[in-house]
A protein has these predicted regions:
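Long, low-complexity or tandemly repetitive, helically biased scaffold regions used
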Residues: 1-105
C-alpha cells in the first residue's frame, strides 16, 4: 500500500476520533455548562483533523483513483472524515453561540 494511501487512512481515523471527541464534549457541556475548556479543545482538534484529511486527500493522484481501488477508497474515507470533523466542529460553534461562549485557542 502506498505511503499516501496510508497517510490518508490514518488522517481519516484521526478525524473520526476527533469527531467523537466533539460529540463527547457536547454531551459533557449539556451536563456541565462550564466545561468549555473541553469544548474548545475538541473544536480545535476537529479543525486540525479536518485540515489533515484534506491535505492527505489532496496528495492522492486523481487519475490513479480511477484505476486503483486503494487510492479511490482512501480519498473517499479521508474526504468523508474531513466533512464529519467539520460538521462536529460546526456543532460546537452553534452550541457556543447559543450559550454565549467564544471558542478559545
Amino acid at each position: 500500500m502506498k505511503l499516501e494511501v496510508r497517510k490518508a487512512r490514518a488522517a481519516a481515523i484521526a478525524a473520526n476520533l476527533a469527531a467523537q471527541a466533539a460529540v463527547a464534549a457536547r454531551e459533557l457541556l449539556e451536563e456541565e455548562p462550564s466545561a468549555w475548556e473541553v469544548g474548545d479543545a475538541a473544536y480545535w482538534l476537529c479543525r486540525a483533523a479536518q485540515k489533515a484529511c484534506e491535505s492527505a486527500a489532496d496528495t492522492l493522484d486523481p487519475e490513479e483513483a480511477e484505476t486503483s481501488a486503494d487510492v479511490f477508497v482512501a480519498h473517499l474515507i479521508a474526504s468523508s472524515a474531513a466533512q464529519e470533523a467539520c460538521d462536529q466542529a460546526d456543532e460546537l460553534v452553534s452550541l457556543a453561540e447559543e450559550l454565549n461562549h467564544e471558542i478559545r485557542r
